[in-house]
Every structure is written in C-alpha cells, then in structure tokens.
Amino acid sequence: MKDLSSYKRVILGRNITLTAGAVYALTRATYYATVNPDAVSPAQGVITGDGRLLGGWAAIWLVAAVLCIVDMINRHTRFGLSMVVGLAFGWGAAYAIIWVCTGFTDQSLLSTAIGWVTPAGLVFGFLIKVTALQDMVRNKGGEGS
C-alpha cells in the first residue's frame, strides 16, 4: 500500500465502498423484485403496502445501485452511497416507528431497526470521510500526489 499515492488509495477506497454499496443495493432490489408478497413479515407489509409496493422498492434500490456505479465512473462518491444511506436509514426508522406503535413489545422490530440504522450510520461516516479525503487530495495536487 505504501507504493500507492494518496490519490490512488482514495480512489481504491472509494471504488471498494461504491462496489459494496452497489452490490448491497442490488441484493435489496433483487429481494423486493422476487419475494412473494404473501411471504413478507407484518412490518414489511406495513412498509410495502402489504406487498403492493414491492416493485417500487425494487426499482428504488436498483436506482441506488446504478448511482453507485455511475459515481465510480464519474469519480465521485456522493449520490449512490447517499441514496443507500437514506434508504437504509428510512427502513430502520420505519421499523423503529412500528416498534413504538405496537407498544414496544416485539424486540425483533427493534433489532431490525438497529440492523438497518447502524450500517447506515457507518456508511454515512465513511462517506463523509472519503469525500473529505477526495477534496483534500484534489486541492493538494491531484493524481500526482
């Protein structure tokens, strides 16, 4: 790694993160596109309108995957990962709201909410760091640095 310039390390880190974001979003899109509406959990039923909105959720997650790939091509990080973070945080918040509205009784809802929000927070923190590093490297002198 020492042989790589700071610019190349930033690009490598960005592309690894964007690839992971694209794969994650693509798996979500595939799940929502293929799951039987009768097989969703009660909480997923609330979020997906009893399965009627599964196709819409599949399309939204697919857009997030495409934006991650476009970000790699365009050499920035902001759009795809921001959408992945927003979607994951939204799903986590929805599970937390359902947990509250059902009287704090189903701990699996809380666990699922945490399972969505925690990775969203980690990716958000990484997104802030990578975009700051990109800006610093660009201001320092770009590819030759």
Task: Walk through the language-model features, giving the residues of each.
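Alpha-helical transmembrane segments of polytopic membrane proteins
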Residues: 51-61, 108-120
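Membrane-helix boundary connector in multi-pass membrane proteins
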Residues: 89-114
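Hydrophobic, membrane-inserted alpha-helices
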Residues: 61-68, 91-95
